[in-house]
Amino acid sequence: MNTSSRIQLPSSNDAHVYDGRSNEPKASKRSYVNLTRQMRPKDALKMNISSPNLKDLSKFADPDAQQWLEGYLAGKLEDNSKTPRSNFVDPLYEELNARRKPNKPVWSLSGPLPHVLGNSVVEKLEARSRASSVSNSRLNSRTNSSVSLKGMDGSSSWKNKIKNAVSNVTDQSKR
């Protein structure tokens, strides 16, 4: 009989493996796992991975909230005067929106997010762009810029002050 062969006794759940060379039982893999579970502290960090429930993101228990969301997504919000208005939607989003053009792919988080602006914000942006297209816009922007203003102490020779400061630093470093 070979003395180095291992014999497993199927007597209990925590089975031990006997080695022919020694009389001491060796712990099986199952008992080793149980031992490591006992040694681990109860508040040990555990990993758990779950995927988000994307189906229920746009569902509300409140029917009014659900109706408001559907109106918002359709661009039919009502203000205090109860007149429907449409939201401004970024043209890039319109181009990538799959509901309007079925042959286009749906935009994803890897692409640009939609920019939905209120009508008042759109009017302000258009007013700014109209004001900047005036023929004197370059002159207006230069007169209002901080570069063309006088120095902090009221003198207009800020360029000379910077040149003098740079030359003083270089002169001191040569010494």
Curated annotation (Swiss-Prot):
Residue ranges with Basic and acidic residues bias: 16-27
Polar residues bias (residue ranges): 1-14, 154-175
GO cellular component terms given for this protein: cytosol; nucleus
Transmembrane intervals: none
Biased composition (Low complexity): 130-149
Superkingdom: Eukaryota
Keywords: Cytoplasm, Nucleus
Protein name (record): Uncharacterized protein C186.04c
Disordered: annotated segments: 1-31, 127-175
Compartments where found: Cytoplasm; Nucleus
Keyword Cytoplasm on entry: yes
Coiled-coil region(s): none
